[in-house]
C-alpha cells in the first residue's frame, strides 16, 4: 500500500536540491502550509540539517542529488529516484523549488496526474552571461512542454521574470508573482546605526554573478581617493556553482586594508548590526535577493545594480541607489554618497523597513502561497493571490 492511500491531511512534497537551501529560503512557506492543514514532506540532499528539519515536524526523504551536474547518468538517476518517491508517496501537491528541481521534478512526473507548483527563483538561463548558452536555449524549448500541464502553476519572484517565461511559451494566466518566502520581520527587527567607521556589507554566496569582483574593484577606487570605508563580506564560495569565486582569490581579499571576509554567518542580523548599508552588485539572474530583503528588514538602506529582482526591493530615491552592472566607478560613487550622508541613510533605512512590512513579510507571503496550494488541492479551485499581479 502506498503512503498516500491511508493519509488524513493532504500531503505537500517540497523538492529542493539542498537541505540548507530549504531552511534558508522556504522554511516560512512550509510552516505556513503546515498551519493551513497540510502534511509537509521534503525531498532533498541531506547535509547536516536532518535534525532541524525533523524537529519542525516535516517528513524527510533524502535524495542522492548532485546539484549543478549536467552528466546524463546523474540526471537519469535522480529523475528515477524522484519518480519512485512520487509513486510511493502520491502527494496531493508537489512544489518544485528553483530551476533544477523544476526541470528534474517535471521530467519525473511525466504521465502522472500530480498537482504541481513550479517556483522559479531567478532566471539565470535567460542571462547573456550564462556560460553554457546551449543549456539556456534547450531550457527555453523544454520548459513550456514540461510546465504547461493540467493542474500545474508557476511562481516567479519579480515581474520581469514573469514576462520572460510568458515570452518563451509558459501560460501567463498560470504564472504568479510570489517573493520567495518573504522575511521574518519579528526575528529581523530594525537596528540602530552602528557607531564608528562607516561600514558597508555584502551578504551572499561568493559567486562571479553576484558581482563581488565589481565590489572589490569599487572599494579599491574609493581607497585610492582616500575614502575610508570598511567593507564586510559575509558568505562563502559555492563549489557546486560554476561561477564560484576561487578560494585563492577570496584569501587575497582578506589581505586588503579595509576589507573583512566574515565567511558564513549563522545569524544574519549580526552582519547588519555592524553595517550602515547593504550592497548587492548582482550581474543578473536574481529572483528577489534574500540578502537585500534581510538588510531592508533591519532598516538598512541599499545599493544595488539595476537588474530584475534587485530593483523590486531596492527602489531608487526611496530606499536605495541603483547602478549599472559591472561598473566599479558608478558603484564607488553610489557607495561614497551613501557613506557621506547620514540623513539620507536614515530616510532610506526607514523606507526599507516600511516596504518589507507592507509587502514582503513571511506572514503575508505565507498567506499568498497557501491560496495557491488550496487552488491546486481543489480546496478553492478558482483562488489566486489578490495583492500581486
Region annotations inferred by a language model:
Residues 44-48, 203, 230-245:
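Glycosyltransferase donor-sugar binding loop
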Residues 330, 337, 344-359, 365-371:
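A short, well-ordered alpha-helix in the C-terminal region of glycosyltransferases
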Residues 192-210, 215-219, 231-232:
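Conserved donor-binding/catalytic core segment of Leloir-type glycosyltransferases
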Residues 235, 244-265:
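Nucleotide-activated donor-binding/catalytic signature segment of Leloir-type glycosyltransferases, i.e.
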Residues 70-74, 166-167, 172-174, 179-198, ...:
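Acidic anion/phosphate-binding donor-loop and adjacent secondary structure
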Residues 280, 301-304, 314:
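Short hydrophobic beta-strand element within catalytic cores of glycosyltransferases
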Residues 315-317, 321-328, 337-343:
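Conserved acidic donor-binding segment of nucleotide-sugar-dependent glycosyltransferases
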Residues 61-62, 140-190, 202:
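Donor nucleotide-sugar binding/catalytic pocket of nucleotide-sugar-dependent glycosyltransferases
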Amino acid at each position: 500500500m502506498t503512503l498516500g492511500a491511508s493519509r488524513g491531511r493532504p500531503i505537500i512534497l517540497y523538492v529542493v536540491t539542498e537541505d540548507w537551501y530549504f531552511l534558508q529560503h522556504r522554511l516560512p512557506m512550509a510552516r505556513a502550509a503546515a498551519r493551513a492543514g497540510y502534511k509537509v514532506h521534503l525531498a532533498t540532499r541531506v547535509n547536516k540539517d536532518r535534525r532541524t528539519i525533523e524537529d519542525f515536524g516535516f517528513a524527510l526523504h533524502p535524495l542522492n542529488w548532485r546539484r549543478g551536474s549536467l552528466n546524463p547518468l546523474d540526471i537519469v538517476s535522480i529523475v528515477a529516484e524522484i519518480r519512485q518517491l512520487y509513486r510511493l508517496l502520491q502527494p496531493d501537491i508537489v512544489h518544485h523549488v528553483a530551476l533544477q528541481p523544476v526541470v528534474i521534478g517535471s521530467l519525473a512526473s511525466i504521465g502522472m496526474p500530480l498537482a504541481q507548483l513550479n517556483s522559479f527563483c531567478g532566471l539565470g538561463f535567460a542571462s547573456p552571461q550564462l556560460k553554457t548558452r546551449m543549456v539556456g536555449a534547450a531550457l527555453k524549448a523544454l520548459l513550456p512542454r514540461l510546465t504547461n500541464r493540467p493542474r500545474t502553476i508557476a511562481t516567479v519572484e519579480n515581474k520581469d521574470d514573469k514576462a520572460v517565461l510568458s515570452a518563451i511559451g509558459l501560460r501567463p494566466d498560470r504564472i504568479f508573482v510570489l517573493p520567495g518566502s518573504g522575511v521574518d520581520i519579528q526575528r529581523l527587527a530594525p537596528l540602530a546605526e552602528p557607531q564608528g567607521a562607516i561600514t558597508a556589507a555584502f551578504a551572499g554566496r561568493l559567486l562571479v554573478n553576484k558581482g563581488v569582483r565589481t565590489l572589490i574593484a569599487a572599494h579599491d577606487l574609493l581607497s585610492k581617493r582616500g575614502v575610508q570605508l570598511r567593507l564586510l563580506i559575509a558568505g562563502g564560495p559555492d563549489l557546486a556553482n560554476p561561477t564560484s569565486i576561487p578560494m585563492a582569490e577570496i584569501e587575497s581579499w582578506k589581505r586588503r586594508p579595509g576589507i573583512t571576509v566574515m565567511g558564513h554567518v549563522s545569524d544574519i542580523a549580526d552582519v547588519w548590526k555592524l553595517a550602515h548599508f547593504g550592497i548587492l552588485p548582482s550581474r543578473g539572474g536574481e529572483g528577489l535577493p534574500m540578502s537585500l530583503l534581510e538588510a531592508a528588514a533591519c532598516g538598512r538602506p541599499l545599493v544595488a545594480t539595476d537588474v530584475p529582482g534587485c530593483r523590486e526591493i531596492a527602489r531608487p530615491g526611496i530606499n536605495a541607489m541603483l547602478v549599472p552592472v559591472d561598473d566599479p566607478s558608478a558603484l564607488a560613487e553610489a557607495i561614497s554618497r551613501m557613506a557621506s550622508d547620514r540623513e539620507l541613510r536614515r530616510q532610506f533605512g526607514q523606507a526599507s523597513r516600511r516596504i518589507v512590512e507592507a509587502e514582503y513579510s513571511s506572514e503575508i507571503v505565507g498567506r499568498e502561497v497557501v491560496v495557491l496550494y488550496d487552488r491546486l488541492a481543489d480546496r478553492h479551485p478558482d483562488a489566486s493571490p489578490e495583492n500581486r499581479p
